[in-house]
Amino acid sequence: VDAFPFVDNPVLYHAVSNAVTKNGKLIYLTATSTEELDKKVKKQEIKRVSLPRRFHGNPLVVPKKVWLKDLRKKIEKKQVPTKLLKLIKEQRKTSFPLILFVSEIELGDKILSLLRRDFKNEIIELVTSKTDNRLELVEKFRNQEITILVSTTILERGVTFPKVDVFVIEANHRLFTKSALVQIAGRVGRSMERPTGKLLYLAEGSSKEMTQAIKEIKEMNREAGF
């Protein structure tokens, strides 16, 4: 079973447990384990099998923390912070697709408007849970018909975009949990054509979740022999 929907949901654990036959096997598949599953491993109630290396044989891309000050204040003044503007300009010289992850739809709307103003040569769209044509936009981004995609955590997992770079805006926001940050990081370096990429956690300061996410990614690389 896919372990992701099980987070903090004892009802699902109970339902699946009841569904397994007497001699049946129950296998949870996940890129980011839950506290409940980790506890079961420590108690030796279940066994953990890890596949830390990607199919192309390269290490996971490790996020880099970047200080980004006064984002909200600048946005309210209808300005993109100078550092963020510079980072995006540098990234666009590569022509690789770029995803900007944001915590909230409202913030995403504002950033979308400002980026369209400042990057008139780019095709920029926003994807959220309320986007009716989300699948269409995702496919266009995959086909490079869209060059910059602003997204909430709706695209943190379950999608693959070749050669993509990722910036997480306000990575220290409470909605960016360790699990979410690890999953978002996993969008980078997924293709054989480009098993690397630029992966930035931008925030005014840091958070426990940011530090834990980076630690977990480094541990997976060590486990894979890097």
Where are these regions (language model features)?
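A short beta-strand-to-loop transition that corresponds to the Sensor-1 phosphate-sensing loop
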Residues: 29-33, 52-54, 102-105, 151-154, ...
